[in-house]
Amino acid sequence: MNWEFIEKYLPMYEKAALLTVKIGIVGILFAILVGLICAAVQYYKVPVLRWIVTVYVELSRNTPLLVQLFFIYYGFPKIGIRMSAELCGVVGLAFLGGSYMAESFRSGLESVEPIQSESAISLGMNSRQVLGYVILPQAMSTSIPAFVANIIFLLKETSVFSAISLMDLMFTAKDLIGLYYKTTESLFLLVVFYLLILLPVSIVGSLVERRMRYAGFGD
């Protein structure tokens, strides 16, 4: 292991990690927004929109992110829509992640027994109170494991951004391997930085899930 090489190119990986995290966070935030909207449409069975959401979810979940990125990055300019590589990464991640988030949120909402909502209404609660005090707390608790898994999955999927010339972690590792043939050192840094990004997400997700279950949500 060449530690001098690692020390020399560590700042390059730090810069790439910041770009990876920035695109990942923005893309995931949009994915959550898309997921919430789609889950609400499916849960309340909104006519027409429900079928549009179903088509979107199936299309998104059954095509690789790399194909989606190529379609956005190389296909959209053919119809006059041009995006930077960073924006393309955000859109691609949001498109893919939105479908996974939608399924997580939908399953969480549907895990709450209808009789609980009916009982709450019989006690005098209105629809907003039922949603806020009965359905959402339990649905959130049920959704957390899948939600955290989706975040980790999407952050790992950022590794394909190098295919559209984004100078992320994977691009940096491949570039250094091609230039200096330092495969072990380059991949070592790649693994270390992905662990630094993903492990905190996993730990925080587990703590939140444990805290909510301790508080009695979802039981």
Q: Which residues fall in each region the model found?
A:
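Transmembrane alpha-helices and adjacent helix-loop boundaries
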Residues: 1-219
